[in-house]
Curated annotation (Swiss-Prot):
HAMAP family associated with the record: RNA_methyltr_RlmN
Domain of life, per lineage: Bacteria
Function as written in the Swiss-Prot or TrEMBL entry: Specifically methylates position 2 of adenine 2503 in 23S rRNA and position 2 of adenine 37 in tRNAs. m2A2503 modification seems to play a crucial role in the proofreading step occurring at the peptidyl transferase center and thus would serve to optimize ribosomal fidelity.
Domain Radical SAM core: 106-345
Pfam families found in the cross-reference section: Radical_SAM, RlmN_N
Cofactor note: Binds 1 [4Fe-4S] cluster. The cluster is coordinated with 3 cysteines and an exchangeable S-adenosyl-L-methionine.
Binding-site residues for S-adenosyl-L-methionine, renumbered to this chain: 177-178, 209, 231-233, 307
Active-site residues (renumbered): 100, 350
Cofactor: [4Fe-4S] cluster
Protein name as catalogued: Dual-specificity RNA methyltransferase RlmN
One Gene Ontology cellular component annotation held by this UniProt entry: cytoplasm
Record localization: Cytoplasm
Amino acid sequence: MQEEITTNREKIDLKNLSQDQLVEFAEKLGQPAFRGRQIMSWLYRPEVRDFEQMTDLAKVFRKLLAENSFFSHFDDPIIERAKDGCVKFGFRLHDGHVIETVLIPEPDRNTLCISSQVGCAMKCTFCMTGGMGFTRNLTPSEIVNQVCAARDFLANEPADKLIGPDRVTNVVYMGMGEPLNNLENVLTSISILTEQKGLDLTGRRITVSTCGIVANMARLGQEAPVNLAISLHAVDDKTRDMLMPVNNRYPLDELLEACRTYPMGKRRRIMFEYIMLAGINDSDTEARTLARKLQEIPCKINLIPYNESPGLPYKSPGMKRILSFQNILREANYSVFIRNSRGEDIAAACGQLATDETTKQS
């Protein structure tokens, strides 16, 4: 029997809730727990835009949902296409701020690089996003809706334009912001992405990148079955202090110790990301130091030729220098890859995400 419910004064976005939280929400509305699971099964269907489409819910309950809640979408994104097939989306949020998301297609996969904050507080000196400053955290719905929008884009893309599959296969939290400074909302978004009734991605296809927020690393590993990437970029505190102010709070040795104790599955490895900056962190000596410091950490290493950005003083080394660095690490039995830069012509490459509005103001 339907209970008498007092309508909430402020509606909530149901896409901010995990399945467990949807169950709690349904129960607060006087409904059995399974109603929350039913709601989850509808929210992430691309064709569903209204509660009236949730046809296995009683009409009186659909009315109650509409009185107390809504579910958001990202419509009409700004879309830029790179020559190499990458697609950059600009999403305008309800408060007028804009975030960027990048789709990186390959023949066997579509990787979506998503943002977790508006701007970033970490002030890494080589990163355009760091120059924006920090505005606010993204909500779980604002994180997940980036994936929903890219999914819908791919589903509607003509077959002759597709480079990879017609769906998002991989998600990386490597866009604007520091995910571990928005841990609660990131964890909720991961729960939704990996929920079968949500977006049904496996945790092995999701990677969360951090510049080294040691205090939140263990909880991420305990609560989210995803991959971890560490933005390392230097092998000594002096250089890392200069490049990444976070190192003043969490020095290199403390970060690496947290990596050694990080809870992860047996076959999982941490990805260390290392931007190659000419004359700063690219010497053979630094390669040998890196090999020594990463001992006893199951890992692979991604070398990233620096994507030059206007107003920043850094340069990328030549490929000969990068290959020498890679060879030293390989001789020490590390798996080492050189990342191919994608989307440079639309400022969608690593470290280049910064909305035009903020760039013009800075």
